[in-house]
């Protein structure tokens, strides 16, 4: 049935907090470690994971890098946060996509953005 298909493939409209917590579980990550790796204020980070705060696009990207998400997963959490997907024809986004694909960490990604005179993520 369509309902089973949607559930099996996680296509239901999940909130950002639901998605983030599902990724934590799926990837065996600890929330505190992700918040630290994302260079987020601890309280603010916990509020994002609890669904009490709506983060900016850059904050969501910080979390994506901290969780080592791929492009598809990153775009899912961006959409859930009400932000635009990473778009390859946008120069800054293209650099971020490249860094995600290469498995770069947040700091290395910021260095690449800086090197190309683009706004860093944080």
Identify the role of each PLM range:
Residues 24, 35, 64:
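The alpha-helix within a helix-turn-helix
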Residues 75-103:
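Short, charged recognition helix plus adjacent turn
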Residues 30-37:
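Short alpha-helical "recognition helix" segments of helix-turn-helix
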Residues 39-55, 80-82:
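Recognition helix of helix-turn-helix/homeodomain-like DNA-binding domains
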Residues 52-65:
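Short, basic-rich loop-to-helix N-cap that marks the start of a DNA-contacting helix
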Residues 32, 43, 72:
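Key DNA-contact positions within bacterial/archaeal DNA-binding proteins
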Residues 1-30, 109-122:
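A short, Lys/Arg-rich alpha-helix, primarily the initiator
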Residues 65-67, 92-120:
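Long, compositionally biased
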């Amino acid at each position: 049935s369509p309902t089973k298909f949607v559930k099996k493939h996680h296509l239901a409209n999940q909130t950002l907090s639901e998605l983030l917590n599902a990724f934590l579980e799926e990837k065996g990550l600890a929330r505190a470690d992700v918040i630290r790796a994302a260079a987020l204020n601890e309280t603010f980070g916990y509020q994002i994971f609890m669904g009490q705060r709506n983060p900016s696009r850059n904050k969501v990207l910080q979390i994506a890098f901290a969780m080592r998400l791929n492009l598809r997963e990153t775009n899912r959490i961006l959409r859930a946060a009400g932000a635009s997907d990473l778009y390859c024809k946008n120069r800054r986004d293209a650099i971020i996509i490249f860094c995600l694909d290469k498995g770069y960490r947040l700091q290395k990604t910021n260095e690449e953005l800086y090197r190309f005179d683009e706004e860093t993520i944080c």
